[in-house]
């Protein structure tokens, strides 16, 4: 334990570590959460002098939007949808531009395009919600089921795979609860989902020198070696890297959740994620989806940390270690679109390469003849990869230093 605390203090004393943590916090929490909620994400859009075309009034807009959505009764039925569309069209006809910003028009418009494509008027420049006849918006859940079936068939997911996905989807409660959706869509679709990509950069910078940096200055390590041995030092470094990973995640996640609670509160936590993407099959509400996404990031970050520390233990050069570490995450992202679909799915199992937004998709893996929904593997395989790398990091470091 003494070795761990020494290594932990040693890591946090580095100026580069403090700078990385500060930059990561500013980028993700200040810009990616607080200012996004208050300004350029949800601020009212009538101030054209602003760099983002938004007023600095996101808190008020969010609260007004939540209150407006609650006026529709809490359940999403044909009548609810008709009322939402009719109300929007009436406000638009009355020129109530400010009031329109309180509506979930982007979400509702995506529902209309998905479920009622025959009502789309290609000659009309307006969005569907502006001109579609509300009385024709019937059979919401029947149409959703039909669209889901058609999507699975077009995707080649038929037979046993289709049945497997239907079994998962069958657990989704209907009718859906309805409150303000746009905030949760932004939160789950980008804010939490992007955390892993952001952490990968700063974890790579900090942890790449954890082992490799000792080749530039061995003094403190040599002193410790006389009493403890390289193996124990390597283990202390591994634990330090894991502790830093968890600490960085906790700092970002807790700060982001506090920001979320301040701006959005808990309203809408029990809505199904199908409100964001109708053909999603996951039987999750918004809160469960958020917990999954944060767990995905934490476990993926631990897995990535294990890989970075293994590379750092095996390579003497700090810069090369950093480049190789970043290539583990960003390399597959850059080449994925040029690869066959099955290979793309395989690359998603690399820590922080896949996306937590797979909970909105119907991707599956077939392992030893058994179908497994992709989110199950995306949250387990990456951390196992990192854990498997850690003993090799210890052995590699000990072997190199003894040589």
Q: What feature does the model see in each segment?
A:
Residues 21-25, 319-332, 350-351:
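Central hydrophobic cores of alpha-helical transmembrane segments
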Residues 217-221:
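Hydrophobic transmembrane alpha-helix segments characteristic of membrane transport
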Residues 224-230:
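Short helix-to-coil transition segments within interhelical loops
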């Amino acid at each position: 334990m003494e070795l761990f605390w020494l290594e932990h203090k040693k890591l946090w004393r580095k100026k580069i570590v403090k700078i990385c943590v500060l930059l990561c916090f500013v980028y993700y929490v200040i810009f990616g959460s607080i200012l996004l909620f208050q300004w350029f994400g949800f601020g009212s859009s009538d101030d054209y002098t602003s760099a983002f075309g938004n007023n600095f009034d996101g808190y008020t807009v969010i609260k007004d939007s939540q209150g407006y959505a609650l006026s529709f009764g809490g359940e999403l039925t044909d009548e609810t949808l008709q009322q939402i569309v009719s109300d929007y069209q009436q406000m638009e006809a009355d020129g109530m531009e400010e009031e329109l910003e309180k509506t979930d028009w982007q979400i509702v418009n995506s529902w209309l395009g998905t479920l009622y494509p025959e009502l789309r008027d290609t000659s009309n420049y307006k969005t569907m919600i502006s001109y579609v006849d509300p009385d024709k918006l019937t059979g919401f859940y029947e149409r959703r089921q039909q669209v889901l079936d058609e999507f699975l068939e077009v995707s080649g997911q038929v037979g046993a795979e289709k049945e497997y996905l239907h079994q998962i989807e069958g657990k989704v409660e209907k009718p859906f609860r309805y409150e303000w959706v746009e905030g949760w869509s932004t939160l789950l679709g980008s804010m939490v989902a992007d955390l892993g990509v952001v952490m990968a950069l700063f974890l790579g910078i900090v942890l790449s020198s954890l082992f490799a940096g000792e080749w530039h200055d061995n003094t403190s390590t040599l002193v410790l070696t006389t009493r403890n041995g390289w193996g124990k030092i390597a283990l202390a470094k591994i634990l330090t890297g894991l502790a830093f990973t968890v600490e960085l995640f906790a700092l970002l996640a807790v700060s982001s959740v506090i920001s979320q609670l301040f701006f959005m509160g808990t309203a809408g936590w029990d809505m199904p994620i199908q409100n964001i993407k109708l053909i999603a099959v996951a039987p999750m509400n918004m809160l469960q989806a958020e917990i999954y996404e944060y767990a995905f990031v934490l476990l993926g970050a631990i897995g990535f940390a294990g890989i970075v520390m293994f590379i750092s233990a095996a390579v003497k050069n700090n810069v090369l270690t950093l480049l190789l570490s970043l290539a583990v995450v960003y390399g597959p992202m850059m080449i994925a679109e040029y690869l066959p679909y099955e290979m793309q799915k395989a690359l998603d199992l690399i820590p922080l390469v896949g996306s937590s937004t797979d909970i909105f998709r119907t991707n599956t893996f077939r392992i030893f003849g058994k179908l497994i929904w992709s989110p199950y593997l995306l949250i387990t395989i990456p951390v196992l990869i990192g854990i498997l790398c850690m003993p090799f990091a210890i052995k590699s470091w000990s072997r190199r230093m003894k040589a």
